[in-house]
């Protein structure tokens, strides 16, 4: 199958780049991951009007939402999300944050994103990567001290 490297039950990974082939239709992509279109449409009602659409016809933001949804709603015990908020409209960022909050109750989630403000409200713990090491981050001042931000 086209998605076999993403179907492990223990861990799933959302890469930075699109991973669903453009020739697939929305329903096929969801079905291959044993997810229901209606579940996606409850979270993101805009997808109701996109029924039958090929993945390659979706906007970059729509495709990113779909990929995030597929990975987050999978039965995996641990999820890796690389830049999940990239190309996502502010309205959908809030919905995606709510989905992440819900899913983290039953699985471990490791999230990396440059848009740190999207992460601070949903993370249990924050770390800054600098000089090949991970440093705990307690507040915005830690982000400045570690060189992630120039100033507040």
What are these regions (language model features)?
Residues 71-72:
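ABC ATPase C-loop
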Residues 112-114:
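H-loop/switch region of ABC-family ATPase nucleotide-binding domains
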Residues 54-58:
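Conserved ABC ATPase signature
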Residues 17, 22-37:
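Q-loop/switch helix immediately C-terminal to the Walker
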Residues 133-152:
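Conserved beta-strand-loop-alpha-helix hinge in the C-terminal portion
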Residues 1-12, 17, 147:
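ABC ATPase NBD coupling module
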């Amino acid at each position: 199958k086209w998605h076999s490297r993403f179907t492990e039950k223990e861990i799933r990974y959302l890469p930075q780049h699109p991973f669903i082939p453009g020739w697939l239709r929305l329903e096929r992509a969801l079905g291959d991951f044993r997810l229901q279109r209606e579940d996606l449409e409850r979270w993101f009602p805009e997808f109701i009007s996109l029924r039958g659409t090929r993945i390659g016809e979706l906007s970059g933001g729509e495709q990113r939402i779909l990929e995030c949804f597929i990975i987050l709603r999978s039965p995996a015990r641990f999820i890796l999300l690389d830049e999940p908020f990239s190309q996502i409209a502010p309205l959908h960022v809030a919905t995606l944050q709510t989905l992440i909050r819900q899913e983290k109750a039953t699985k471990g989630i490791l999230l990396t994103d440059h848009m740190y403000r999207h992460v601070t409200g949903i993370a249990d713990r924050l770390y800054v990567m600098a000089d090949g090491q991970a440093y705990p981050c307690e507040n915005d001042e830690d982000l400045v001290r570690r060189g992630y931000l120039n100033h507040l």
